[in-house]
């Protein structure tokens, strides 16, 4: 038996498996839900990300503490817009989401001081966090990842990791974007009705109130796909789309955009015929949706700029500032032009 497996079994048999922290019994709307005894900010030097939204939060706040990324492999592509520190991070696999690819043995061998996840904080993810902390002996923090709470997420996780100064600068930019979005939502009058298109044929979508459509909904745009008892993703039929007749169609996938704009069936929708299909593919991560992390601040800002000339006038400066603060990268003119074309 190798030492990693022996150590893991030791946790489970000796009673060293962590009990739930008292903080974990907080109300369901708590922003940070910890499991286990958290390290002090001065001792949290090795941080493990549990999923893609946490990757984005942590590479913004503390890339030097990250052991690696859960979902992105920058040795393949997408790293030219990021700092050297981020570019060198390995892909380790993910804990949360569909089909975990990171084993408990691997977690123990990495010896993190803390595991952080961000996104949905429902009972499924709380159960995973509690179980992982108990089985590995590593404290785990679940961050409720709603877009409107981005500034608070940055401040609270920044304080947890001892990087409050950096977090405050990021939080202030997030607050400015969100406050402008809130003002726009109140002043826009008849809000456009939108459909968020995902997948090869555009018939996967985010339900109203889901993490996947917050960037548009934060601006007051109305999601045509609403199911009060459900959140998350759903498959719809084209017949349903014809009944909904959205004013605009949003996507962040260039292949989805091409399919929608070139397929004869989709031309039955007024939004397609009128050229109201907006594609914000973004780089190096999706801007509107995937992953549903703080990267969506950019998608929200870009979408507001489409409707608001005052925001459009400063879009280039906002884009540069976001990359400087969140991705620790000063864009050159070539990179900036590529981003403007992608968004």
Where are the language model's segments positioned?
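C-terminal segment of N-terminal export signals and the immediately downstream linker at the start
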Residues: 1-2, 22-39, 47
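N-terminal export signals
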Residues: 7-28
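Extracytoplasmic substrate-binding proteins
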Residues: 30-31, 37, 41, 126-204, ...
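Solvent-exposed loop/turn segments at secondary-structure junctions
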Residues: 53-56, 72-75, 120-123, 146-150, ...
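A short, structured surface patch at a secondary-structure boundary
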Residues: 54-109, 114-123, 221-224
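A ligand-binding cleft/hinge motif common to bilobed small-molecule-binding domains
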Residues: 122-133, 251-267
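Alpha-helical, coiled-coil/dimerization segments enriched in small aliphatic residues
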Residues: 208-232
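Ligand-binding pocket segment of bilobal, Venus flytrap-like solute-binding proteins
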Residues: 225, 232-256
């Amino acid at each position: 038996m190798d030492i990693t497996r022996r150590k893991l079994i030791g946790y489970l048999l000796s009673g060293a498996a962590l009990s739930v922290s008292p903080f974990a019994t907080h109300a369901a709307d708590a922003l940070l839900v910890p499991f286990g005894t958290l390290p002090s900010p001065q001792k949290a030097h090795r941080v493990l990300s549990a999923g893609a939204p946490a990757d984005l939060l942590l590479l913004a706040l503390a890339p030097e503490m990250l052991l690696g990324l859960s979902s992105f492999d920058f040795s393949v592509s997408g790293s030219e817009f990021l700092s050297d520190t981020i570019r060198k991070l390995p892909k380790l696999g993910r804990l949360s989401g569909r089909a975990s690819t990171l084993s408990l043995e691997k977690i123990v061998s990495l010896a993190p001081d803390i595991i952080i996840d961000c996104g949905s904080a429902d009972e499924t993810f709380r159960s995973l966090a509690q179980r992982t902390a108990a089985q590995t002996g590593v404290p785990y923090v679940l961050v409720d990842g709603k877009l409107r709470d981005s500034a608070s997420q940055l401040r609270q996780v920044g304080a947890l990791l001892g990087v409050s100064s950096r977090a405050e600068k990021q939080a202030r930019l997030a607050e400015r974007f969100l406050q402008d979005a809130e003002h726009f939502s109140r002043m826009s009058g008849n809000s456009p009705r939108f459909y968020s298109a995902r997948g090869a044929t555009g018939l996967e979508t985010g339900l109203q109130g889901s993490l996947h459509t917050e960037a548009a909904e934060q601006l007051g745009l109305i999601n045509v796909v609403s199911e009060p008892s459900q959140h998350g993703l759903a498959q719809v039929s084209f017949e349903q789309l014809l009944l909904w007749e959205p004013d605009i169609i949003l996507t962040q996938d260039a292949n989805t955009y091409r399919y929608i704009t070139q397929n004869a069936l989709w031309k039955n929708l007024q939004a397609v015929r009128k050229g109201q299909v907006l594609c914000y593919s973004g780089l190096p991560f999706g801007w509107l949706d995937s992953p549903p992390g703080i990267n969506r601040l950019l998608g929200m800002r870009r979408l507001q700029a489409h409707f608001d000339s005052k925001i459009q006038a400063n879009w280039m400066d906002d884009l540069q500032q976001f990359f400087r603060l969140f991705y620790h990268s000063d864009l050159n003119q070539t990179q900036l032009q590529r981003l403007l074309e992608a968004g």
